[in-house]
Amino acid sequence: MNHRKFEKWSPWILLVAVVALWQLICSAFNVSEFIFPSPWRIWTQFWEFKTIIAGHAWRTFWVTMAGFGIAIVVGVLLGFVIGSSRLAYAAVYPLMTAFNALPKAAFVPILVVWFGIGVGPAILTAFLISFFPIMVNIATGLATLEPELEDVLRVLGAKRWDVLVKVGLPRSMPYFYGSLKVAITLAFVGTTVSEMTAANEGIGYLLISAGSSMQMGLAFAGLVVVGAMAMLMYELFSAIENHTTGWAHRGSQNG
């Protein structure tokens, strides 16, 4: 197996090794399934409750995608405004940083009061926790446009808007796709956290229900499903990134 193939398969090799070690430790030390279930127990619970898990997983998925979609729109618009103006960058960026430092789980009770139990708090929590990386990366890509390049374009007759749209935004695409891969995982976290306290369905609700009934295998199966959905979306954005912004990674690919 050459280096490139090994690099491609390395995550799966590591995953299999971790699962095998996990199973070995649980079997060797007779770990209680009520404390730390083995991979085999998690699989049996997953298969037994696969229909129920699928229903909760679908709810978590589409709610996450709704919040994530809003985050993309708001993040790109805010990032464009902040990155295209020094005044906006100086005025808005510190406030957004302070807002991002607030624990998003603390917003869930407030959102429940405003919107009630259901999809509203989950969608908004997914949005609140995931828009910041998108905004920051778009703003960074625009704000770090080389002054020399901008001067040359101005000499050639380009206006400020032309520079931002035709040069700044394409240059920001690697930053944008990088932010999507981070933001989508955060969106799943936000949805799951909200569902644990403000929903009657979804993987977060399943985790609370399984934990309260001491079904640790089912709870871990729910966690695995969330991780799998996040990983699939991450790989999807990675594939799109490689096909659309391969020029930005040619140096690392050749190395």
Protein language model features and the residues they cover:
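Periplasmic/extracellular loop-to-transmembrane helix junction in inner-membrane transport proteins
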Residues: 2, 28-72
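Hydrophobic alpha-helical transmembrane segments of multipass integral membrane proteins
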Residues: 13, 17-21, 54, 58, ...
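Loop-to-helix entry region at the N-terminal start of transmembrane alpha-helices
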Residues: 55-63, 113-134, 177, 218-223
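Cytoplasmic-entry segments and transmembrane alpha-helices of multi-pass inner-membrane transporters
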Residues: 77-112, 136-143, 151
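Transmembrane alpha-helices
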Residues: 124-128, 161-193, 221, 226, ...
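Short cytoplasmic-facing helical segments at TM-TM junctions of multi-pass membrane proteins
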Residues: 134-137, 141-182, 207
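Hydrophobic alpha-helical transmembrane segments of polytopic membrane proteins
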Residues: 204-241
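Short cytosolic juxtamembrane segments of multi-pass membrane proteins
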Residues: 241-255
